[in-house]
Design a protein with these regions (language model features):
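Substrate-binding groove of N-acetylhexosamine-processing glycoside hydrolases
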Residues: 9-12, 16-18, 23-26, 91, ...
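Generic recognition of short, well-ordered alpha-helical segments
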Residues: 39, 43, 161-162, 359-360, ...
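Beta-rich nucleic-acid/ligand-interaction surfaces
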Residues: 61-62, 186-189, 193-195, 335, ...
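Feature activates predominantly on carbohydrate-active enzymes
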Residues: 87-316, 325, 374-376, 380-382, ...
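Contiguous, structured surface segment used for ligand recognition
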Residues: 6-146, 397, 420
Length: 534
């Protein structure tokens, strides 16, 4: 029987008491009485089979029975009473109780989501040698909305099958929001010029993705940039006249065609994505006031012009029963103007580099009565490999600040500014965001680093965890000598240029240590693979 601290669970449950392990050598049965829980039963059974276990019909002699029970049913009452576990009102929306003891397992939830999350924890309790770690767990999330965003406009555009795998994976670690970032890669039938053929999400793809995600209790939040970041639209002559500057990046607020274009896009989005949120972006409108609206900005100021157009967007869209998210740049640029915003907007404050000092990003919105989410980042863009030496403290600090100040959600971001980033190296940061969003208070980085390899890769040797630490150290080493981490800029820098020669002189001093860290990581991963295959 493992001690509590040795169980590699991500996220960590709020309350966990150890019980004797259960032997699974004679099979496992999974039963669900509620129709809404039958997919969870199927998903759990599939996961157990993938672990090499035998899934048998309920009532099979000697098999460990898993019962998915709703709160208030006889099975739930019996399990809670036997474990002397109580049910708190905070657990109702997504919480669960798990009792794995005396040859049986009962997962209790007041909702389908709660039962599903209990089943995800049960998957992680299955250890080697066909054993299940016995435990009594009570658990529920700190934040209502726990998400990850993937930039599908500026880097590799994922296939529908890959996005489904992303959904399955984030759901397994109790994330419930998957946000897709669109500049020009959502296909609008009314605007066929915009989306690249074969490199965009079609309406049929969107419907399939939404339906698939719903089974895993994941809400798809579409983000269509509606103000800035629109060069791939405005580069076309048909739309160029709507730009603040010729073929630029920002819509001109004063152009009579700007708002109708946005309304048309979001009418299509409204028919494809039925969830409670849509995201209008509206960040980094750097060109605003440098072109057609310069006289207006000179007269009224940049903040009022920006906020007036954002308010017009919100008023024009205002879908019944849905909330509009927007990026919270204005808290930095014009905090005194925030009170002019419609109060039903949700401000998503973002910062990808700091480890503390987040209150000024949230307070202007909270003081104005707006709901807030926080958006840290995995720091995998513009880099050969994510800079987790920066990302982990950023995710840790920002989500903890959001919890403390009353934010209702966290959206951990993965960007592709350079067009070269791949998503797979981001899972380390994504899972830490899942832990920080579900667990109350400040997530422990060291604890996460100790758990990741076993929880995500199935490596119980610690080799994967140590490999990640070596790569963190490599980034920190490059930062310490002023080279800014393993950036694409450094990778592609011409070594014969004056700047390249300067960087090379600095690099030579740390190159042996840097290469050893990378070589260590390669050897450690190879060791983990060898142990797993053996």
């Amino acid at each position: 029987m493992l001690l509590l601290a040795q169980l590699p669970l991500i996220p960590q449950p709020r309350e966990l008491a150890s019980r004797p392990d259960l032997a699974l050598t004679r099979g496992v049965s999974v039963a669900a009485a509620q129709p809404d829980d039958r997919f969870t039963a199927q998903d759990l059974g599939d996961a157990l089979r993938e672990r090499g276990l035998r899934v048998v019909p309920p009532g099979t002699p000697g098999a460990v029975s898993v019962t998915l029970a709703r709160l208030g049913t006889p099975a739930a009452r019996h399990a809670l009473a036997g474990a002397r576990a109580t049910w708190d009102s905070a657990m109702t929306a997504e919480g669960y109780a798990l009792v794995a003891d005396s040859g049986r397992v009962t997962i209790v939830g007041a909702s389908a989501a709660g039962v599903f999350y209990g089943a995800q924890t049960l998957k992680q309790l299955v250890g080697g040698s066909s054993r299940l770690h016995g435990a009594v767990i009570r658990d529920w999330p700190a934040l209502r909305w726990r998400g990850v965003q993937d930039d599908v406009s500026r880097g590799p555009v994922p296939t529908l099958d890959y996005e489904k795998r992303q959904i399955r994976t984030i759901a397994a670690y109790k994330l419930n929001v998957f946000s897709l970032y669109f500049e020009h890669t959502l296909a609008y039938p009314a605007d066929p010029l915009i989306a690249p053929p074969g490199g965009a999400l079609t309406p049929d793809d969107a419907r399939a993705l939404v339906a698939y995600a719903a089974r895993y209790h994941v809400t798809i939040v579409p983000e269509q940039e509606a103000f800035g970041h629109l060069h791939h639209v405005l580069k076309h002559e048909r739309y160029a006249e709507l730009g603040e500057t010729p073929h630029g990046h920002v819509l001109a607020p004063g152009d009579s065609g700007s708002l109708p274009l946005i309304i048309g896009w979001f009418a299509a989005i409204d028919s494809l994505f039925p969830g409670p949120f849509v995201h209008v972006g509206a960040d980094e409108t750097f060109e605003l006031g440098r072109g057609r609206t310069k006289p207006l900005v000179d007269s009224l100021g940049l903040g009022p012009v920006y906020l007036e157009f954002l308010a017009r967007i919100a008023t024009a869209l205002h879908p019944a029963g849905r909330r509009l998210l927007f990026w919270g740049d204005v808290a930095v640029t014009s905090p005194d103007q925030v009170k002019a915003l419609p109060h039903d907007l949700v401000a998503v404050a973002w910062n990808y580099w700091s480890k503390d000092g987040f209150d000024p990003l949230l307070k202007p919105f909270l003081d104005a009565g707006l709901e807030t989410w926080v958006a840290p980042g995995v720091n995998g863009w513009n880099r050969v490999f994510p800079d987790y030496a920066t990302a982990l403290p950023n995710i840790q600090g920002f989500i903890a600040a959001g919890q403390r100040l009353g934010s209702t959600g966290a959206l951990n971001t993965s960007w592709d500014d350079d067009g070269e980033a791949l998503f797979e190296p981001n899972w380390y940061g994504v899972l830490f965001g899942a832990a920080a969003s579900w667990q109350p208070g400040t997530a422990d980085v060291a604890e996460f680093q100790r758990r990741f390899g076993a929880a995500f890769c199935g490596d119980t040797t610690g080799a994967v965890d140590e490999a990640e630490r070596r790569l963190l150290a490599a980034h920190a080493l490059l930062d310490s000598v002023g080279l800014g981490g393993a950036t694409d800029d450094l990778f592609w820098l011409d070594p014969w240029s004056a700047r390249g020669q300067t960087a090379a002189a600095v690099m030579r001093a740390v190159a042996p240590r840097l290469r050893l860290l990378a070589e260590d990581a390669i050897e450690l991963v190879a060791r983990a693979r060898s142990t797993s295959s053996g």
